[in-house]
Amino acid sequence: YPTYDNAKYFGTGYLLLMDFDANHSVKVGMNNALSFDKYLEDVSTWDVITDNGPVLSFSSYNQCLHAFSNPEDLPFTSERGENEQGTGIGGDYEFIIVDAPEDASYMMLKGKKRGTYNLLTPLQEGVMFKDYLAEINEFSTLMFGNNILEPDVLHMGDAKYRFADAADGVP
């Protein structure tokens, strides 16, 4: 899913885990820079609204999800002299539902504000978010090293491989 936005994309993406229930409650879990590399979980509400088509809206504040749309300065970028006051990361909390097959094998979303595509895929029932994210982080550390400033470097034995344009926003 390409994007035609000329804005400069940054970062390599953030993994969020979500558990939606039929009562319009959603549990969101994450462990990344926006949670200061600690596991964070919050529960809020969701709804599907109509706005030139179906839109998934996170209609109440969620500490995990709304960290991406909060227009505050990011404290962990201050050392680099960056100031995001007024824009933050520029993330969304309302998403156009681009594709949602009847078999629920995935859902493709597009942020209403930024236009970034997001893919939702189901996890197995009963997966504990905190444990799952710990396993992902353990694998990432094994493959990409610990305390590496640029996560676009793959370590294989003594060899290091750098990925060019790994975060250009185009899948």
Task: Mark where each language-model region is.
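Conserved hydrophobic positions within beta-strands
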Residues: W46-V48
